[in-house]
Amino acid sequence: NPKEKSRLPKISKLDSNNPLKFDLYESNIEPYLRFTHKMNIKMASWVKVKNITQDNEMARCQHSYIAHYNNVSPQERQDICNLTVGSWDIEAFSHTSRYSNINEFPNPENPLDIITQIGTSLYKFGTKEKVKHVVTIKSPIDGECDPVDGVIVETYDSEKDLIEGWVKFIIKTDPEILVQYNGYGFDWKYVCARAKVLDIEYILENLSRIESKPAQLHEDQLNTSAYGDNTMQYLKMYGVTQIDLMFLIKKEHKLE
């Protein structure tokens, strides 16, 4: 704002021995919330954007544009766009449980407790398009996984290649929503820990849709009457909505 800029020289010349105090309002409001409120835009609703400029360097989306915020306006539409929704789950191997009589949960810091497979199901909302996909490790005894009807099976020689193959699949199919069950309590933490052991954390960074914001393991503490005390650990993928069904079930049903 030119008027605001014109005040800066005057402020810089104030006597530093007599500091002034200013009230700061709404400093904790995220810019996008302020934007949607100012433009009267409802969350997860349709908008119309005019005078756009295509930008292929800012994001990894199918379509990426730049526009002035004044050129974004709300649209009264009730239909839902064809979002791609993905559900995924991992299987991990406990070397101790497999080769001893001790029933021990897989430990991601143990080099032998590898991820053996990651399964993903995709569907496009409002259509009958569905994809079932699994990446798995080649067995030293049985070799590659047998074909599975209706499922795309990719077999890899190593856990490193398996994780990289899954990341490439997610980037290629580009789901807007990812659904897990206890993903915030186990899956993401395990995947990120294994990536660290294998020194391939950089591969997971590419799951963000925003070039300038790599995906990173994020931890949140949640304390509510509905959910109780919870620690959530997940890979923060900018531009992708993630849902953990376990938290929804805990909210709707009292588990004993």
Go through each PLM region and give its residues.
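The two-metal-ion catalytic cores of nucleic-acid processing enzymes
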Residues: N1-E256
